[in-house]
Amino acid sequence: MIELDINASDKSLSHRAVIFSLLAQKPCFVRNFLMGEDCLSSLEIAQNLGAKVENTAKNSFKITPPTAIKEPNKILNCNNSGTSMRLYSGLLSAQKGLFVLSGDNSLNARPMKRIIEPLKAFGAKILGREDNHFAPLAILGSPLKACDYESPIASAQVKSAFILSALQAQGISAYKENELSRNHTEIMLKSLGADIQNQNGVLMISPLEKPLEAFDFTIANDPSSAFFFALACAITPKSRLLLKNVLLNPTRIEAFEVLKKMGASIEYAIQSKDLEIIGDIYIEHAPLKAISIDQNIASLIDEIPALSIAMLFAKGKSMVKNAKDLRSKESDRIKAVVSNLKALGIECEEFEDGFYIEGLEDISPLKQHLSQKKPPLIQSFNDHRIAMSFAILTLALPLEIDNLECANISFPQFKRLLNQFKKGSFNGN
């Protein structure tokens, strides 16, 4: 059994810890922060808004919030981070000042009307490019009034932006989504003194009566990052793996449950139940079978590219449906998955909200065929999850990835850990 502490702090929790600290009044401590490019964008924006950030240890910070959020004299650069842009939009909607949020070409092409509409329901003054569809976003902070909103999509980022505005609005606001999305925002904010109640699937959010409590958070390992190595184990014969200190929030382990249904042996060992459930995950290789995925999409949307690799090793036709939001990520992930697999000669096809993949009962003929020519070049589309998913496939097939460096957005240690996996040894530090 190989033990692996991937030392890849959870991306969702890292973002939220930084952003929520701005609603506190006293210094907050964030330990084991994810030093990926996305989370560093949130940290830099906090500094631009007046927070004092001090490095206290490796990957750990003391964040002293400003007495009042400062109006910046420059654009707030979210780079490639949709979480930064959407959550800061909610936070800043009620703050005094003018704020402009922008990002790289990829982020500025991603849909933003999904947060502009609910924020406008509060009376927020927010504008986006091309009739509010895209960033850059301009926000003129103003007083907000409570509202009720039913989201047409299940999105933790949309929900979080709404909650951050609701905490600063006059009156109690209500939020409903058609499917449960990640709930870290509700869990963290409630632990810090926010009044957020779930009434029959409807979130009731009361305005803050006082600043959030100061906190000292240690971030657990990211299940989305850990899943890449669960996939590696699942497709590598005779392999067994122990992933340590992983966040086991039920809204974050759906991909592991899907892999389990496909035939992989997966067990959880809970180590603590404090703010979030944290524990270890045991994975053992076993033959995989095809699967159809059309439910709980919001809980596994980020892992679907990796699951597509598992589907390649699963006998029969696997299907993904109701996942249209994959087209609005860092790349069109439906197109990215299918075009790369087709380039390898795999039978697959895309449709508007998903794709199908005809799995291979035996991958060795494909490996032999590819070994007789120059390794195919996988197109990452500069999307970290596409790059890492197909990098795992290099464990079984001779491939090259055009830009594996984009993994640094969410998982800076990925390339090194993958090389260690190939050698059969790990050191997550």
UniProtKB/Swiss-Prot annotation:
GO molecular function: 3-phosphoshikimate 1-carboxyvinyltransferase activity
Residues reported to bind 3-phosphoshikimate: 11-12, 16, 155, 157, 302, 329
Protein's pathway: Metabolic intermediate biosynthesis; chorismate biosynthesis; chorismate from D-erythrose 4-phosphate and phosphoenolpyruvate: step 6/7
Enzyme Commission number(s) of this protein: 2.5.1.19
CDD domains from the UniProt entry: EPSP_synthase (cd01556)
Active site annotation, chain numbering: 302
Binding positions (phosphoenolpyruvate): 11, 82, 110, 157, 333, 385
EC top class, as a word: transferase
GO BP annotation list: amino acid biosynthetic process; aromatic amino acid family biosynthetic process; chorismate biosynthetic process
InterPro entries xref list: Enolpyruvate_Tfrase_dom (IPR001986), Enolpyruvate_Tfrase_sf (IPR036968), EPSP_synthase (IPR006264), EPSP_synthase_CS (IPR023193), RNA3'P_cycl/enolpyr_Trfase_a/b (IPR013792)
UniProt keyword annotations, A-Z: Amino-acid biosynthesis, Aromatic amino acid biosynthesis, Cytoplasm, Transferase
Subunit record text: Monomer.
Function: Catalyzes the transfer of the enolpyruvyl moiety of phosphoenolpyruvate (PEP) to the 5-hydroxyl of shikimate-3-phosphate (S3P) to produce enolpyruvyl shikimate-3-phosphate and inorganic phosphate.
Alphabetized NCBIfam families for the sequence: aroA (TIGR01356)
Family: Belongs to the EPSP synthase family.
Protein name: 3-phosphoshikimate 1-carboxyvinyltransferase
Organism, scientific name: Helicobacter pylori (strain G27)
